[in-house]
Design a protein with these regions (language model features):
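Compositionally biased intrinsically disordered regions enriched in Thr/Gly
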Residues: 21-295
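Positively charged n-region of N-terminal signal peptides that target proteins for export
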Residues: 1-9
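Core segments of small alpha/beta cavity-forming domains
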Residues: 71, 94-104, 292-380
Length: 452
């Protein structure tokens, strides 16, 4: 009997301890585990292929489109659909984003349908006005949009393809259509919108569109394309948001100008591929988080950002306020710097130390190119241009744990009177090293031997 009482007491104690370990409110239902949802492209697209004919069976117009669609899948790889309820249901962000993307694709399809109907009216009138001999040479009108290229990053998708219209002319009209979509916000990206966001480079006065435009112009110059372009082609390039399409792929951003924008129609669309290393730091931190960019590309992007800072001391002038009066110091004129909150030497040093070591920052500041006066920062006018004998530059990142070194290789060129142009100098390879440590995935350089 005594043994039985001991056993019952032990069981009672165990049950009471278990009850204390988990406090359950019977009035509240158990919260189900949240399923992990993912956004994927569907196998089936939004498509249409239709022929519109005259009464005699002649094809007047062909309309065709093929547009991608998104859907949401569960962890069990089943298509997600929101629960049916008479009350308000919180729709998951992933589902809302997929709906927003599909709505834009439907809008593009509807716009093509409307354009096709207008073109069909023109085609009927055109065909009706032809005699029998002329009808023998009839070529149908066309409206097409085929978006068949896709690149999906962790938080962003880009889709692009070609549009084609023919309204009875000697040739049709080709165009590039592209969309880049933020899967986390359900919004489409624009160059204007990206330009408006603060970034590492925008704090230095370098906008995204200006960075991209300069990269495009460098490619045109390197490939000798300018002689085939319209005289005012550069003005269109500097207004990228209004004149070009863009999309992201696994290597960078692609800027595309439709035919007849910067070059004659016969030259077709002009496409420029710009690696992430050239513009990554001109993107805001949110957009950076959407992209799967290799660490080496980020480090080389840090080189370009730091080169901008270096140039303020050894090559050019930082952004200045042209309307502010200059000041005299050390026998020379200094102009008011226009860098937002960077108004003192201490603030400038803090900015430098985000990118280079304290020792290197102090070395640059010791050049005397910046002075502080009455709570404002001033810089000496120092534009001297770049080294035009540099022919090519390439970069390789070598790692040693969380630190490393950028290895820069440059080749030289020289002027040739016979050809009237620069020619490469054989055996002119020169190597420069840029040692760095990393902080939050970005480089902090301890040496910057830029050959300018």
């Amino acid at each position: 009997m005594k043994k039985l009482l001991s056993t019952l007491l032990a069981l009672s104690l165990a049950l009471s301890l278990g009850a204390c370990a988990v406090k359950v409110d019977p009035s509240e239902p158990d919260e189900p585990a949240k399923d992990e949802l993912r956004i994927v492209f569907t196998e089936e697209h939004l498509t249409k292929e239709a022929e519109y004919k005259a009464d005699d069976g002649t094809v007047l117009l062909i309309e065709k489109y093929d547009l991608p669609q998104l859907e949401v899948r569960t962890s069990a790889d089943e298509v997600y659909t929101p629960p049916v309820s008479n009350t308000v249901v919180d729709v998951p962000q992933e589902y809302a984003a997929a709906l927003a993307f599909n709505a834009e694709m439907q809008h593009a399809a509807d716009a093509l349908d409307a354009s096709a109907q207008e073109a069909l009216t023109m085609a009927r009138e055109h065909y009706a006005g032809l005699d029998e001999e002329q009808r023998a040479y009839w070529a149908n009108y066309a409206e097409e949009l085929i978006v068949d290229s896709i690149c999906q990053h962790s938080g962003l998708v880009s889709v692009w393809g070609g549009g084609y219209s023919n309204y009875g002319g000697a040739h049709g009209w080709e165009s590039i259509r592209a969309w880049s979509f933020d899967l986390t916000t359900g919004e489409f990206l624009t160059l204007d919108g990206l330009d408006a966001q603060p970034s590492t480079d925008s704090a230095l006065g370098e906008s995204l569109t200006h960075t991209l435009a300069m990269a495009v112009l460098e490619q045109i110059d390197a490939q000798g394309l300018s002689e085939y372009y319209f005289e005012d082609y550069a003005s269109y390039i500097f207004d990228l948001a209004a004149n070009a399409s863009f999309y992201f792929d696994d290597k960078g951003i692609v800027i595309v100008f439709d035919p007849a924008v910067i070059a004659p129609y016969a030259a077709s669309a002009q496409k420029f591929e710009i690696p992430y290393s050239r513009f990554y730091n001109a993107l805001d931190s949110h957009t950076q988080s959407l992209l799967n960019v290799l660490q080496d590309e980020i480090i080389i992007a840090d080189y370009y950002t730091t080169k901008t800072l270096w140039s303020w001391f050894y090559q050019t002038t930082p952004p200045i306020d042209a309307n502010a009066p200059a000041v005299m110091a050390n026998g020379q004129s200094f102009n008011r710097v226009s860098l937002g909150e960077i108004n003192t030497l201490d603030a400038l040093r803090a900015l430098l130390c985000e990118h280079v070591s304290a020792e290197l920052a102090d070395e640059w500041l010791a050049t005397g190119h910046f002075v502080e006066s009455d709570g404002a920062l001033y810089a000496a006018w120092a534009d001297r241009g770049s080294d035009i004998t540099i022919d090519t530059e390439s970069y390789l990142v070598a790692w040693n744990g969380d630190a490393g070194e950028i290895m820069q290789t440059i080749t030289r060129r020289e002027w040739n009177d016979e050809t009237g142009d620069f020619v490469p100098v054989p055996g002119s390879e020169t190597y420069y090293g840029y040692p760095f440590t990393t902080m939050n995935r970005h480089a902090v350089f301890s040496a910057f031997p830029c050959p300018s």
